[in-house]
A protein has these predicted regions:
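Structural recognition of alpha->loop->beta junctions
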Residues: 99-124
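Conserved N-terminal subdomain of the carbohydrate kinase-like
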Residues: 1-57
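Structural alpha-helical scaffold elements that stabilize or flank donor/cofactor-binding regions
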Residues: 46-47, 107-108, 138-140
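Active-site beta-loop-alpha junctions enriched in small/polar residues
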Residues: 33, 59, 89-93, 120, ...
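Charged helix-capping and loop-helix junction motifs
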Residues: 67-74, 98-106, 129-136
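Conserved phosphate-binding/catalytic region of the ribokinase-like
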Residues: 75-76, 127-174
Length: 174
């Protein structure tokens, strides 16, 4: 369904090059700045319906007008009885102001039903090393229904309804 696809002759979709080092750590090179998605306006947003989902990441929060549009969308879908999934997917080189990044992350966490954090994002947001009690405390503080912290090859830790669940990573052969 491409009902809400908008074409813009002046802005292009970003191309991102991903490099993996020997330890499996990724680095990113963004080839188009600013990318078309950062020009999303509130007038581009649909009318949300009960039960619908919105998924977004912090890249949408890194610049205006997409920042205002993203927060407007998150609020609107919640009011309509829908749900918000948030994966910060932090790319620090897209943020010039760490204080603004933290403010935006806090606001997004308050509006999200499901949040997926990497271990690095967990440390940035919580200021702590990861343990089960702290994961559920963060979920409770922000009223997040399901909080997932991915641990690379070790799998994922999930806090859902105050209970912690551990799921092992799976080996994938390409």
């Amino acid at each position: 369904d491409i009902t809400y696809l908008k074409q813009d002759e002046w802005h292009r979709t970003s191309t991102v090059l991903v490099d993996l080092n020997d330890q499996g750590e990724r680095s990113f090179t963004f080839m188009v700045r600013p990318s078309a998605d950062l020009f999303l306006e509130t007038t581009d947003l649909p009318c949300w319906r009960h039960g619908e989902w919105l998924h977004l990441c912090s890249i949408a929060l890194s610049a205006e007008p997409s920042r205002t549009s993203a927060f407007t969308a998150m609020t609107a879908i919640r009011h309509a009885g829908g749900f918000v999934s948030f994966d910060p997917n932090i790319r620090e080189d897209l943020w010039q102001d760490e204080h603004l990044l933290r403010l935006c992350l806090r606001q997004a966490l308050q509006l999200a039903d499901v949040v997926k954090l990497s271990e690095e994002e967990w440390r940035l947001i919580s200021g702590k090393t990861q343990n089960d009690r702290d994961i559920c405390a963060l979920a409770k503080d922000y009223e997040i229904a399901m909080l997932l912290v991915t641990k690379g090859a070790e799998g994922v830790v999930v806090c859902y309804r105050g209970q912690v669940h551990h799921f092992a990573g799976m080996s994938v052969n390409c």
